[in-house]
Structure formats: C-alpha cells, structure tokens
Swiss-Prot record:
Organism of derivation: Saccharopolyspora erythraea (strain ATCC 11635 / DSM 40517 / JCM 4748 / NBRC 13426 / NCIMB 8594 / NRRL 2338)
Protein name as annotated: NADH-quinone oxidoreductase subunit H
Encoding gene (name): nuoH
UniProt feature, compositional bias: Low complexity: 415-427
Lineage: Bacteria, Bacillati, Actinomycetota, Actinomycetes, Pseudonocardiales
Membrane topology classification: Multi-pass membrane protein
Transmembrane segments: 13-33, 83-103, 123-143, 164-184, 197-217, 243-263, 289-309, 323-343, 356-376
Amino acid sequence: MTNTAELLADDPIWLVLIKVVAIFAFLVVMTLFSIWAERRVIGRMQHRPGPNRAGPFGLLQSLADGLKLAFKEDIRPVLADKWVYFLAPVISATPALVAFSVIPIGGEVSVFGQQTALQLVELPVGLLVVLACASIGVYGIVLAGWSSGSPYPLLGSLRSAAQVISYEIAMGLSFVAVIMYAGTLSTSGIVEAQKDGWFALLLPFSFLVYVVSMVGETNRAPFDLPEAESELVGGFHTEYSSLKFALFFLAEYINMVTVSALATTLFLGGWHAPWPLSAIGGGVLNTGWWPVLWFLGKTLAFLFVFVWLRGTLPRLRYDQFMNLGWKFLVPLSLLWIIAVTVIRALRNNDAVTSQQFLIAGGVVIAVLLVATFLIPDRKVPESDGEVPLAGSGYPIPPLDLEVPKAPPRRSAVHAGAQAAPAGQLPGEGAGSTKEEPNGSV
C-alpha cells in the first residue's frame, strides 16, 4: 500500500465521521459561493451589479434563495410516478457527493493529534470510481423526466442521457494518457506523479478534451441542451418545485465542483503548489495545511471557466453538439492515445525525449482540429420542385390538402322551428295554416 493508504487505514471512526461532515459542508458552501459568484460575474459581464442586498456584497443571497425554495409549496403532477418522482433528485445528487470522497485535497496533516491524509478514501481504482459516479448521476435525470408524466421533462432527460453517453467516452479517453504517464489509477498516485510537472503541459490535448467533456457532463452552457428554456421550458426539472427543485440545483453545482476538483487532480498537480512557489524553502509550501489553499485556488479557477463560458457562448444546436463529440473529440482522442503510446515506446528505447514528441503531436492534433472545423460539411443537394413523400429518408405521412366543405347553414325556418313553444308543431303559429291530407285547407 502507498503511504496515503496506510495513513487512511489507521483513521479512527470519529476522524472518518469528521471527514464526511467536512466534505459535505465544503461542497454545500462551495455550491452557495459558486451560485453567488456566477451571478456577480455574469452581472458584471452584462453591466449590472448582480445580487448585492442580502448580506455583505450579497453573499447571503444564495442562502436566502434556498430558504425561499424550502418554504414554497411542493406540487406533484397528477400523472407523476410518486416514488420515482421523489427519489430522482436524491439519485442525481448522491453520486456527486460520493465521487468527491476519492479526491485528495492535501497531504499529511495532524487532526487532534492524529496523523492522517486530507482524503476520505484511497482506492487503487479511484479514477474509475469517479467515472462511474459521473455515469450514475444521469439516472436521476432520466428518472425525473420519465416519472414527471410530461413531454418536456422526458425530452430533456433523453437529451441528457445521449449527452452523457457521448461525452463520457471522450472523458474516459482523456484519462487514458494520464494513466499511462502516471502508471496508476489511484488519484493520490496521479497527484504524486505531477510533483515535477503538470500533466496539463505534458498532455495538452487530453487536458483540452477533458475541459470540453466536463462542461458537457454537467449540462452547463453552452451545452445545457437538457434544460434549454427556449425549447423545453425547463427540461427535466420542469415539473419540480420546492426542495426537490433545489436538490437538482445542488446536484448540478456539486457536479461542477467535483469535475473541477478532478481536473485539478489530473492535470494541475492536485494540491501541489504551482511553480515557483513549490521551490521555496525546499517545498515547505507543500506541507501542512498549505496544500488546501492551492487545491482550492485551482478548483475556483475551473469554476470560473464555467461562468466564463456561460457568459460568452450561445447554446449549441443539438446536432452541432453531437457532431462535436462523435466526429471530433472521440476520433482525435484515439489518435492522441496512439501518439502517446508511440512516444512511451520510443522513450523506453531512449530514442527521442517524450517532451519533443508530445509537443510535435500536440501541434499535429491542433492542426487537424482546426482543419476539421474549417472544412465545410457536405450537403445533400435538394430539388426545389419535389415534395418528400412517404418512403423517403424522413417519411412524411400523406396529407389531405383539400379544403373542407363549409358546413350547412341553418335557414330562418329551421331557426324558428327550434324556437317553437311546447305542444306546438314546428312551423305552426299565429296566422299559419295546416294542410289536410286530402289537400283542403
């Protein structure tokens, strides 16, 4: 076992409980802060102040909004599946909390005289646990859309499922190069492998793919198609209110914090101090509680990227979003992994330095990526004089374009007949005559 695993194995129960409560409190506070910071930054981008009333600088605005949601009426649609409808927000929020348990926040510290590592659990396959939790979280969204009994939530949940499937592949491929260079699936081992250099500089294309994938995984702008207001009203949480609606917001922002912390762990050296601070005093800033500060600063930098993208980029069309994942990220990631594999093989033979090959490979991949965006899409020629009929590529049911006949209009006699008093035949009245069967009057 590694040193981190040995430290965590000796943790008493009370220390484990303290870590669990601390992680939960940290994620909740980060959620409240992220919502406030996002609204303030977006406000500045749009030349308005943002929330500035509740508390100093508006810091208590998120807490006030949470309390407001807690006291709102909890409405359940008539057609909703009761238990699935209630459990869906919990299923969406729980995996995000679990995923953070394997992320190292710092090194070895002393807590009430007990030596431990600032990490809840150390697993040999910790990276796969994070990937699995990211996949499980979409179940809550799918169940929410299906159980609401409404078409808009169902469409939003299906979009989210397709989105996660598409970008989970690209995210997993971005992990492969990191695993090859770190030689382990352990998150603490990956952090230790970056003490001499960040993987973001060594594996720039993997870093870029992960950043794009993490935005798609969290359903954030410009990839917020599952909850597109202009198309789906509110998406998968259209029919939710009160605390269940707040749970979806909590899950979204906890996911943002988790993927940002994972990006810090995989590509920015984790809790290690950035250069040149890491060289001060022989690495004294990488000991004690200092690593928490570096980890928090890097995580906040990634959270700012989410806000920046939301404030600057418009929402993509659904076909553009799928094309980006399947036609660009996945194929280029496979080419990048092949290049990294060749580099590792040549490095073992001392033929060429890995840095030279990685720089050359990154340039080639960047050129290919730019070229794919510049090449126009091939369009199928369309005939102006033909109408698509049933049996074509997109079958259209035959339409009866004949104008319907006007309904018969009632005459004055019929109208008077309907108004005849009781006991009087239609057409009879004052001054009317009745014809006898023999023709006499």
